[in-house]
Amino acid sequence: MALRFPRFSQGLAQDPTTRRIWFGIATAHDFESHDDITEERLYQNIFASHFGQLAIIFLWTSGNLFHVAWQGNFESWVQDPLHVRPIAHAIWDPHFGQPAVEAFTRGGAPGPVNIAYSGVYQWWYTIGLRTNEDLYTGALFLLFLSAISLIAGWLHLQPKWKPSVSWFKNAESRLNHHLSGLFGVSSLAWTGHLVHVAIPGSRGEYVRWNNFLDVLPHPQGLGPLFTGQWNLYAQNPDSSSHLFGTSQGAGTAILTLLGGFHPQTQSLWLTDIAHHHLAIAFIFLVAGHMYRTNFGIGHSMKDLLEAHIPPGGRLGRGHKGLYDTINNSIHFQLGLALASLGVITSLVAQHMYSLPAYAFIAQDFTTQAALYTHHQYIAGFIMTGAFAHGAIFFIRDYNPEQNEDNVLARMLDHKEAIISHLSWASLFLGFHTLGLYVHNDVMLAFGTPEKQILIEPIFAQWIQSAHGKTSYGFDVLLSSTTGPAFNAGRSIWLPGWLNAVNENSNSLFLTIGPGDFLVHHAIALGLHTTTLILVKGALDARGSKLMPDKKDFGYSFPCDGPGRGGTCDISAWDAFYLAVFWMLNTIGWVTFYWHWKHITLWQGNVSQFNESSTYLMGWLRDYLWLNSSQLINGYNPFGMNSLSVWAWMFLFGHLVWATGFMFLISWRGYWQELIETLAWAHERTPLANLIRWRDKPVALSIVQARLVGLAHFSVGYIFTYAAFLIASTSGKFG
């Protein structure tokens, strides 16, 4: 009996129902709630699991490299990146008939293969990899790192190597390690790789370990560094006629500030990228040495925060008490980390397409669409997680005495003002945006399109103009040839930048109009509503006027029983649950907008987006319906094509999504009755009744069923859109 799952909770292990299994899985990673957990063991478990996480990441990336080297066509892709389709891996599928085998045999492969839409080929090519042998070497190296990570994780669980709690709470040393050690040194190392391997590679020079010490990255070597003539490293950059990967038109510069894109690859100049990473390395190496560690010099985080008291008294005691609050709360730290990572991930999505860093990736339209969508959805999940852990912090870790009248306490004190302002903004955006869309729909339905309300986004156009876009006719800042800003940058980075901003073949500063104005406000509605739900969930997590003792019920509770009306659906978990639906909806609008705008740009018919995006029927008919034709007809009685797998996934995604509603709409009683009927039938059926179970089958709890429903809704939603996105883009552009 003692060994029953879950071993970390004796109470659950003795539960006689199937609740034991589901609750066990649900709380397996909630180390804080486990029996006889100590603060020390908590920190050590989390620390060790980080190494496990790293091992999985290294193993996964190793697998990417290995499969492309084994089954891909990297070497032939390198010869002609614009016309050879990159292969991710082979497909072994006994279900394939002859038509399917033919349809999926592409990219010069001997059998059926999957095409890569992840951009790894462009990335590996840009950083200097050229042969399958290079890929195998990389795969082996990552496998080695994976093994090292596993060993490190195991080692730090052994008594001799277990770090103490004080080690984990040494904030200054951690900043030193992360800022200088991880960000600084890795950025410097990456600059080194770009300068020594990638840039020579882009100029036709193959640098590997055997000639690494013989090939000078710059003709003058380290001379200019030691004599202070750093500008020499920027002289003689690659010319605009440079053919990437060859010496034709190549220069000798290694650290430049050219601005704009390489004309052939349509990606940022590698020498600009190296310069950027060197600057980042310098900033982080300095930043990591600003805090007091072993030598008694530098800032103490605690002293900094204690001193942050605004002189006017408007923020009370300012940051007093925050150091201990944050440093002693893992949830607060995780919330901060997730919020930062979520913002960064969304920024990655925006910058990967507008300022592509990898050679030729801008011309691989399906990859561009897939990467944008992928990073935006991940950002959404990470951001909602940040608020979830913020709410858990308020329930489990927040100490009112420690934070009296500081910024954290004051935020809780005026939460009503925060929540009601967010509510007002959401209502305003929602009614006005929907009102405009619906008005325009009615005008089109009644045959008077000229009566639409179309608003030009003049402020956004002015901002684009200030950064150098000339087509709107605002003569301002960088779009004004007489301004000081224009003249200051004219000889350095501006020619490349201005050329890129005003060139209509890339995605930098797309021309915007009334359709963009409307969808921008629809997205703003989604963002504000998602934020409203998340912020309210966190600020009301400890208690509200309706339920002042809420924190005593924990993070996720269904209700406080039948005797106390109105306590259902108000746990912090419920807020997270509701917010995820809004998050998915919002990112749906974001990705619809991005994709439709770009499809029309790539096809050269931007007027379709401009004319149809100002009313809802335009979105439904000219974006969703028009682009789903390949999916709706993916496989039929007359055969199939290479899009059929996406057509199947489109259907399957809808199925998973719809299954979610089965868990979201019906409640426990229905399932409990059904389960008891099925158990009765099972026990009376010959042969079947030979199989017995130890746990009495019971329905999922309300919170669990919501989680299962939410998971199906999310996964189905994303599967459906992924299939639509990849099929509609690759079907048009190959």
UniProtKB/Swiss-Prot annotation:
The keyword Oxidoreductase applies. GO terms for cellular component: chloroplast thylakoid membrane; photosystem I. The chain crosses the membrane at residues 46-69, 135-158, 175-199, 273-291, 330-353, 369-395, 417-439, 517-535, 575-596, 643-665, 707-727. InterPro entries: PSI_PsaA/B (IPR001280), PSI_PsaA/B_CS (IPR020586), PSI_PsaA/B_sf (IPR036408), PSI_PsaB (IPR006244). SUPFAM superfamilies: Photosystem I subunits PsaA/PsaB (SSF81558). Belongs to the PsaA/PsaB family. NCBIfam families: psaB. The PsaA/B heterodimer binds the P700 chlorophyll special pair and subsequent electron acceptors. PSI consists of a core antenna complex that captures photons, and an electron transfer chain that converts photonic excitation into a charge separation. The eukaryotic PSI reaction center is composed of at least 11 subunits. This is Photosystem I P700 chlorophyll a apoprotein A2. The gene is psaB.
